[in-house]
Amino acid sequence: MSDPADYSKNELMIAASARLLAGVENCFVGVGLPNVVCNLAQRTVAPELQLVYESGVFGARPRRLPLSIGDPTLATGATAITSMFELFAFYLQAGLIDVAFLGGAQIDRFGNLNTTVIGDYAQPRVRLPGSGGACEIAIHAKKILVIMRQAERSFVEKLHFRTSPGHSGGVEHDRARGWSGSGPTNVVTDLATYRFDEETGEMTLGTMHPGVSFDDVRASMGWEPRVAPDVAETPPPTDEELRLLREDLDPAGIYTK
């Protein structure tokens, strides 16, 4: 499938994100698009992937796409079912989570995320859901993958509030603060994919999706992005990935359309 008309933007985001999980042992999943991503990866590039859900489920192998982190299908065949406290304390904070997905209303060039407020904190224009466990996940998971739609209002020079830390002062700064995780490593949007510079911690354009130009990317963010010397076109979803998404994981198109 090479024609963008053959697949949706969400299907491309999901497929591109799932490929980043090749060889990963376990992943803190979450809800929404990451839920579809991880279940697709488990059926393609990472068949041994252990799906970890915030509700206390480790090693989920759901027979269908779970509707939430509390969906009963997650319990069937799971490696372990524990409490949310134990999952965070003895798995996440112990450094046993390889990859976790996060998203947000805003992200900056260093991968810091805002899920708290839009506007002034004391008198916000919009009050968002908040951190939940995102701050702890951002600090303690070995790697963070971010998946979100790209727009100038969400890719901002300065966050209205920093909920979950990225590489705020560079990679060495993060390590000096005692954070056990490596922070964000990749961002996947509906326009492009990004990775983070190992020294500066700054987001770097890695690939652009089929039909997307650099001008499209630049117009959808609040700063001049770093561009990798080997920037390329994002590989489109394969026929098998699309079949799994449309027939197995999300036949109703709740997340993929």
Where are the regions that the model predicts?
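N-terminal active-site beta-alpha-beta segment that forms phosphate/nucleotide-binding
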Residues: 1-78
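Conserved phosphate- and dinucleotide-binding cores of soluble alpha/beta proteins
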Residues: 2, 65-233, 237
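Structural signal for hydrophobic packing residues in well-ordered secondary-structure cores
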Residues: 21, 25, 41, 45, ...
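Generic hydrophobic, helix-prone segments enriched in Leu/Val/Ile
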Residues: 38-39, 187, 245
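Short, Lys/Arg-enriched charge-dense amphipathic segments
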Residues: 48-57, 76-78, 110, 125-129, ...
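A conserved C-terminal secondary-structure "cap"
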Residues: 220, 228-257
